[in-house]
């Protein structure tokens, strides 16, 4: 069980880093420049939430759920982190100086969660062997 707990360290660290980045006061950001033209902020949100979902799915898969339950857990995680992103927009609006609510950030968070879900599903669920999924029989283990 101790080994399984170690798999939760990277996603917990990423959660702490992400929360810190999402709660930086708006005065700490540079003023408008060429980065606004390429929507760098949205790409950062996509990447941040893609990594969030991927890391949490990677940790959850170590808990040895069968394929169906694992897929449901992955979907739950994607929805959870999308809700977290939406909640952080409200935190930014009401509690962080010089930050505001941006529907574009919520959309970027959702896209990142979907990309993380698809990648995690393809990487972790599709590669499960019959023994790992708990449906091992004599015929498929030979």
Description of each model-found segment:
Residues 1-104, 110-132, 136-142:
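Bulky hydrophobic segments
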């Amino acid at each position: 069980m101790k080994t399984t707990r170690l798999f939760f360290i990277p996603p917990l660290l990423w959660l702490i880093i992400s929360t810190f980045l999402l709660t930086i006061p708006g005065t700490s950001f540079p003023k408008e420049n060429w980065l606004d033209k390429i929507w760098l902020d949205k790409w950062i949100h996509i990447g941040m939430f893609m990594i969030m979902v991927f890391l949490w799915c990677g940790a959850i898969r170590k808990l040895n759920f069968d394929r169906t339950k694992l897929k449901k857990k992955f979907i739950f995680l994607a929805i959870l982190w999308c809700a977290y992103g939406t909640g952080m927009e409200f935190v930014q609006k009401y509690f962080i100086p010089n930050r505001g609510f941006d529907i574009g950030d919520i959309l970027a968070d959702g896209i990142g969660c979907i990309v993380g879900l698809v990648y995690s599903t393809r990487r972790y669920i599709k590669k499960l062997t019959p023994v790992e999924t708990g449906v091992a029989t004599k015929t498929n283990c030979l």
